[in-house]
């Protein structure tokens, strides 16, 4: 009877070891679950970004307002008759930073 109990304890220990540390065990399950949650969060962020990009594409396809806005903001275009003022931030010495745009005469 003692030998039978000892054999059962060894078998139980082996099964527990396999459950906790073996392939597809609880430790690996926890790691895979955490990885899955991270991937789902990344996918959600990417889906939101894709939606914004799709909206931008539709705006660009449908009207000139979005194109005009991009040209004004990114390329510095101005309409004829407008006056453009650029406000430069101050650097750490308290002086205005110089613009990288060439001066026009």
From Swiss-Prot:
<feature type="topological domain" description="Cytoplasmic">
    <location>
        <begin position="1"/>
        <end position="3"/>
    </location>
</feature>
<keyword id="KW-0175">Coiled coil</keyword>
<dbReference type="GO" id="GO:0030428">
    <property type="term" value="C:cell septum"/>
</dbReference>
<dbReference type="GO" id="GO:0032153">
    <property type="term" value="C:cell division site"/>
</dbReference>
<dbReference type="InterPro" id="IPR023081">
    <property type="entry name" value="Cell_div_FtsB"/>
</dbReference>
<dbReference type="GO" id="GO:0005886">
    <property type="term" value="C:plasma membrane"/>
</dbReference>
<comment type="subunit">
    <text>Part of a complex composed of FtsB, FtsL and FtsQ.</text>
</comment>
<comment type="function">
    <text>Essential cell division protein. May link together the upstream cell division proteins, which are predominantly cytoplasmic, with the downstream cell division proteins, which are predominantly periplasmic.</text>
</comment>
<keyword id="KW-1133">Transmembrane helix</keyword>
<keyword id="KW-1003">Cell membrane</keyword>
<feature type="transmembrane region" description="Helical">
    <location>
        <begin position="4"/>
        <end position="21"/>
    </location>
</feature>
<comment type="similarity">
    <text>Belongs to the FtsB family.</text>
</comment>
<keyword id="KW-0472">Membrane</keyword>
<protein>
    <recommendedName>
        <fullName>Cell division protein FtsB</fullName>
    </recommendedName>
</protein>
<keyword id="KW-0131">Cell cycle</keyword>
<feature type="coiled-coil region">
    <location>
        <begin position="28"/>
        <end position="74"/>
    </location>
</feature>
<dbReference type="Pfam" id="PF04977">
    <property type="entry name" value="DivIC"/>
</dbReference>
<dbReference type="InterPro" id="IPR007060">
    <property type="entry name" value="FtsL/DivIC"/>
</dbReference>
<feature type="topological domain" description="Periplasmic">
    <location>
        <begin position="22"/>
        <end position="105"/>
    </location>
</feature>
<keyword id="KW-0812">Transmembrane</keyword>
<keyword id="KW-0997">Cell inner membrane</keyword>
<keyword id="KW-0132">Cell division</keyword>
<dbReference type="GO" id="GO:0043093">
    <property type="term" value="P:FtsZ-dependent cytokinesis"/>
</dbReference>
């Amino acid at each position: 009877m003692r030998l039978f109990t000892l054999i059962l304890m060894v078998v139980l220990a082996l099964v527990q070891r396999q459950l906790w540390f073996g392939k597809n065990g609880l430790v690996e399950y926890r790691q895979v679950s955490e990885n899955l949650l991270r991937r789902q969060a990344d996918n959600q962020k990417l889906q939101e970004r894709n939606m914004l990009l799709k909206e931008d594409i539709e705006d660009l396809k449908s009207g000139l307002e979005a194109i005009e806005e991009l040209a004004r903001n990114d390329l510095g275009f101005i309409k004829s008759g407008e006056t453009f003022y650029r406000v430069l931030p101050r650097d750490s010495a308290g002086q205005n930073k110089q613009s990288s745009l060439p001066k026009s005469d």
